């Protein structure tokens, strides 16, 4: 089963808890976090996400997809120094394992700019290939592809999320999950948001990387791709 607020409230009463799952598309929050974010029984599920609820309709503290956004917005912001140090430590750890290149699908431009500084300081230990999140797609079109002469940093693509994951019961299926009363969710990136980005990406030659797992989500996305290809002259 998935953890709920009842599993953690007893020892986290004084502090809000936001604990993302390893897949990054679901999280556990405690009662303090629910109160701070203003999430109640009456709060509707957002497009592209859902609040898991008990039989009485109360949020259990397990949140998926875009239902994580209210909690992410109230998290304290990290400093640039903290983020830069984490990037440097990550680069060192990767190099120590013999990795010569990594890919980050969804790295914000804030982190990209910090990586540029690290590169200028001569502290890049391996190549990094970047796709920025779909929320920063317009900035990607504005900046264009950014690539260092030594190939250590290549900012090229745009990362899109359509549904959740099978493990979190968030991937959008045609039928309900065998152990749940729902079939997942779509809309993490709504069609109305995605189509103009697809058209621009096809026109500019920008790579699109799409997270799409469930059969219902895959069918929809392929239709959208087809629509974008047919509407865009190349």
What is the predicted role of each segment?
Residues 1-141, 156, 160-217:
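Divalent metal-binding segments
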Residues 7-8, 144-146, 230-231:
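Short, flexible, glycine/charge-rich loop motifs used to bind or transfer phosphoryl groups or to couple energy/partner
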Residues 51, 146-147:
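C-terminal capping/extension segments of zinc metalloprotease domains
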Residues 120-125, 148, 228-234:
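Short helix-capping segments at alpha-helix termini
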Residues 147-149, 154:
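Acidic/histidine-enriched ion/cofactor-binding microenvironments in catalytic or ligand-binding pockets
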Residues 200, 223-231:
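Conserved helix-loop functional segments at active or binding sites
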Residues 210, 221, 232-234:
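Extended hydrophobic-aromatic, low-complexity segments
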